[in-house]
Swiss-Prot record:
Gene that this polypeptide is encoded by: clpS
InterPro entries given in the database record: ClpS, ClpS_core, Ribosomal_bL12_C/ClpS-like
Function text: Involved in the modulation of the specificity of the ClpAP-mediated ATP-dependent protein degradation.
Protein name, per record: ATP-dependent Clp protease adapter protein ClpS
Swiss-Prot/TrEMBL GO biological process terms: protein catabolic process; proteolysis
SUPFAM superfamilies assigned to the protein according to its UniProt record, in alphabetical order: ClpS-like
NCBIfam families: PRK00033.1-3 (NF000670), PRK00033.1-5 (NF000672)
Transmembrane segments: none
Subunit and interaction comment: Binds to the N-terminal domain of the chaperone ClpA.
Length: 105
């Protein structure tokens, strides 16, 4: 048995099990525009919670501003729920009405 064969575990997975395994459901995390949250705060949120650089964060902030909402990313359910909760909590702590939601992708 070669090293490559030894590392190939594909043969250990039953066909029925392989067919039953499905990728996790994915969810879009969305920022919703409001008339009160400063643009700089939205950029801060996008950098802090979604790891965007300032240029991309600014582009997304403008999408939120002009189109009413923007997708910040697509994640598994647990990650999406955590990001939504963290953004909403951060907004409240800073006394901004910014709303972050999720929807199935």
């Amino acid at each position: 048995m070669s090293k490559r064969d030894w590392l190939d575990f594909e043969h250990l997975v039953d066909d029925e099990v392989r067919d039953a395994i499905k990728p996790p459901s994915m969810y879009k995390v969305i920022l919703v525009n409001d008339d009160y949250t400063p643009m700089e705060f939205v950029i801060d949120v996008l950098q802090k919670f979604f790891s965007y650089d300032v240029e991309r964060a600014t582009q997304l902030m403008l999408t939120v501003h002009y189109e009413g909402k923007a997708i910040c990313g697509v994640f598994t359910a647990e990650v999406a729920e955590t990001k939504v909760a963290m953004v909403n909590q951060y907004a409240r702590e800073n006394e901004h009405p910014l709303l972050c939601t999720l929807e199935k992708a």
